C-alpha cells in the first residue's frame, strides 16, 4: 500500500514536471520586414511567452478592468427622496381601503424605488504580482494560438503616414483583424499614423495591460519591443 502511494506521488510529480516543461516552451515565430516579407525566425522568451495559461486569473483581471471603467453614476430615488407624499392619503381605518401612509410608497405609481442603484465607485485593485502573472498568461495564450507577429525593427516614420501602416497590415494579412501594436519608445508620427485605422490599438510596452492583449486578435511588435516587454515583466 505504501509502495503504491509512493509510486502514485512519483507519477504525479513526473507528470507535473512534463506539464511545466511543455508550458515553458516558447514559440518560434517568423520575423517580418517592414514590407511584410518573412526574413528570419525568432524565439520568444519562454518565461513570458511560454508560461502556463491561468484562465481564472485572466477572467478576474478582465472583470477588474471592466469594473474600473464603470462611471458608477446610475441613480434612483427611494421613498424618502421622491417629491411629495408627506401627507397620509386617507385615515387608517374606516374607509374599506387598504391602509396607506404615503402616495410615494414603492407599491404606488410614481412611488420610490426599493433598494435601487445609487452613485458609487466600482473600482478596485489586484496585487501587482497577480497583474503581472495575468499579463504573462495573456501573452502566453497569444503565443500558443500563433497570434503574435514580430517585425525586424521599429517603424521610424519621418512624418505621419497612415498609408504606410495600412500597407504593412495588408502585407501581414491583418487588415480586417483587431491588432495591438506595441512599440518601445514614444513616436508621435507613429501615433498619428495609426489613430485613423479602425482596427489598430497602439500602446507602448510599458503601459499595455491584460485587457488590451485579450481584446485584440493579433499582437504586433518588433524585436526591440520584445526585449523591453521581457525587461518589464522580469523585474
Please place each PLM-identified region on the residue numbering:
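Short, structured surface segments that line ligand/substrate-binding pockets
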Residues: 71-75, 80
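Extended polybasic, low-complexity segments that bind anionic RNA or targeting/receptor surfaces
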Residues: 1-67, 71, 117-235
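Glycine/serine-rich anion-binding loops at beta->alpha junctions
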Residues: 79-115
Amino acid at each position: 500500500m505504501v509502495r503504491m502511494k509512493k509510486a502514485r506521488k512519483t507519477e504525479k510529480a513526473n507528470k507535473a514536471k512534463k506539464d511545466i516543461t511543455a508550458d515553458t516552451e516558447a514559440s518560434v515565430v517568423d520575423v517580418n520586414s517592414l514590407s511584410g516579407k518573412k526574413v528570419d525566425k525568432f524565439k520568444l522568451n519562454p518565461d513570458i511567452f511560454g508560461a502556463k495559461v491561468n484562465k481564472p486569473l485572466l477572467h478576474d483581471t478582465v472583470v477588474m478592468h471592466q469594473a474600473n471603467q464603470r462611471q458608477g453614476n446610475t441613480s434612483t430615488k427611494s421613498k424618502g427622496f421622491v417629491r411629495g407624499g408627506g401627507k397620509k392619503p386617507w385615515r387608517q381605518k374606516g374607509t374599506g381601503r387598504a391602509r396607506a401612509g404615503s402616495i410615494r410608497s414603492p407599491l404606488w405609481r410614481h412611488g420610490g424605488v426599493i433598494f435601487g442603484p445609487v452613485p458609487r465607485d466600482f473600482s478596485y485593485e489586484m496585487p501587482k504580482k497577480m497583474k503581472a502573472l495575468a499579463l504573462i498568461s495573456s501573452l502566453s495564450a497569444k503565443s500558443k494560438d500563433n497570434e503574435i507577429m514580430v517585425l525586424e525593427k521599429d517603424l521610424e516614420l519621418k512624418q505621419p503616414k497612415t498609408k504606410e501602416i495600412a500597407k504593412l497590415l495588408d502585407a501581414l494579412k491583418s487588415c480586417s483583424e483587431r491588432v495591438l501594436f506595441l512599440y518601445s519608445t514614444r513616436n508621435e508620427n507613429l501615433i498619428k499614423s495609426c489613430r485613423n485605422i479602425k482596427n489598430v490599438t497602439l500602446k507602448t510596452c510599458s503601459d499595455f495591460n491584460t485587457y488590451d492583449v485579450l481584446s485584440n486578435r493579433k499582437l504586433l511588435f518588433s524585436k526591440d519591443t520584445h526585449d523591453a516587454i521581457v525587461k518589464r515583466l522580469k523585474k
